Structures are given as C-alpha cells and as structure tokens.
Amino acid sequence: LAGDQILPRITSNVSIMASEPTADPLREWLDSIAKFRAALTGDELILPAHGFPFTGVHARLDALAEGHHDRLDALEAALKEREMRAVDTFGILFARKVDDSVYGIATGEAMAHLRYLEYAGRATCIVRDGVAWFSA
C-alpha cells in the first residue's frame, strides 16, 4: 500500500505547512523515496491512493526523484537571474497554470522547493516587509 507516497502519474504534494514554516519536507520526501527504492525489489504490485495499481516501482521512484531534481535545478537557475517569492516560481515548478482552487497547495509546494535549495546552500532567503524573497 503506497498511499500518496508513490503515485503512478502525478507527484505527491510535498508542502511547507503553516505549522512548520522552517521544515524541509522535500528533503524528507526525497530521502523516503530512496529508502523505498532500497527496500523494494521492483517487482511489487503498488497500490496507490490515486490511480490504478501498477508495477515497475523502481522506474517510477527514479522518475519522481529526477523530476524534482530537474525542477530544483531550473528553480536555482531562475533564482540566479532574479529574486523570487514562492508565487513567482509557479511557472517553473508546475506544468499547468495555478488557479485559485490550488493556490494554497501550490504555494506550500513552492516553499518546500525553495527551502530545500536554501538549506542545501543553493539559495538564500531574505524577509522584507513580511515577504520571503529567494535568490541564488
């Protein structure tokens, strides 16, 4: 039973929550993906919380990790060009336009990516007038 951790077509929502604004959930999630990969043979039938059961978990775990690392690299490159708030990163992180129905979730996920870069020493955060601005 994979729950929301390993989904066949979409990625899990990995977000900074208001109750833990300094957390590093993306690092924790990527670490857990690596642990799953080491613990599973690759032949298991995966039962996700969303979508159909599937096999080939190693390829899926690799794709999930690579996708996040690709977005982190693109985000870092953009932060070298200009300062950004979490909401400024949506076009880099998400394939679809972020509408009002998912704005909060998207902001939390953007913050998770920004904090990951910050804690890895690949970005810095400055708070001005209550707004977190990131640069690399």
Regions found by a protein language model. Name each.
Residues L1-L72:
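Metallo-beta-lactamase
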Residues A74-A136:
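C-terminal regulatory/interaction regions
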